[in-house]
């Protein structure tokens, strides 16, 4: 049976945690930041976790994670 290819875009966006979850970065923090409130930018800074609803898709994209 051939090896399964990892989706390279997903490999760059998600990191697996020790407990089996996936860390991700929040969206809306790359450009056009002047009109966004400081509070909004501050809350977007820490890493988020992939929800359990999306976990099936992420695991399918990262078969060896």
UniProtKB/Swiss-Prot annotation:
GO cellular component term, pick one: cytosolic large ribosomal subunit
Recorded superkingdom: Bacteria
Key word Ribonucleoprotein present: yes
SUPFAM superfamilies listed in its UniProt record: L35p-like
PROSITE patterns per the UniProt record, alphabetical: RIBOSOMAL_L35
Taxonomic classification: Bacteria, Pseudomonadati, Pseudomonadota, Gammaproteobacteria, Enterobacterales
InterPro entries in the record: Ribosomal_bL35, Ribosomal_bL35-like, Ribosomal_bL35_CS, Ribosomal_bL35_sf
Region (Disordered): 1-22
Similarity annotation: Belongs to the bacterial ribosomal protein bL35 family.
Basic residues composition-biased segments: 10-22
MF (Gene Ontology): structural constituent of ribosome
GO BP terms, alphabetized: translation
Pfam families, per database record: Ribosomal_L35p (PF01632)
Protein name: Large ribosomal subunit protein bL35
Gene3D superfamilies reported in the protein's UniProt record: 4.10.410.60
Keyword annotations from UniProtKB, A to Z: Ribonucleoprotein, Ribosomal protein
């Amino acid at each position: 049976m051939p090896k399964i290819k990892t989706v390279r875009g997903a490999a760059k966006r998600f990191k697996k945690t020790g407990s089996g979850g996936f860390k991700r970065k929040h969206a809306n923090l790359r450009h056009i930041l002047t009109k966004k409130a400081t509070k909004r930018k501050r809350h977007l800074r820490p890493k988020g976790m992939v929800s359990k609803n999306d976990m099936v898709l992420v695991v399918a994209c990262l078969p060896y994670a």
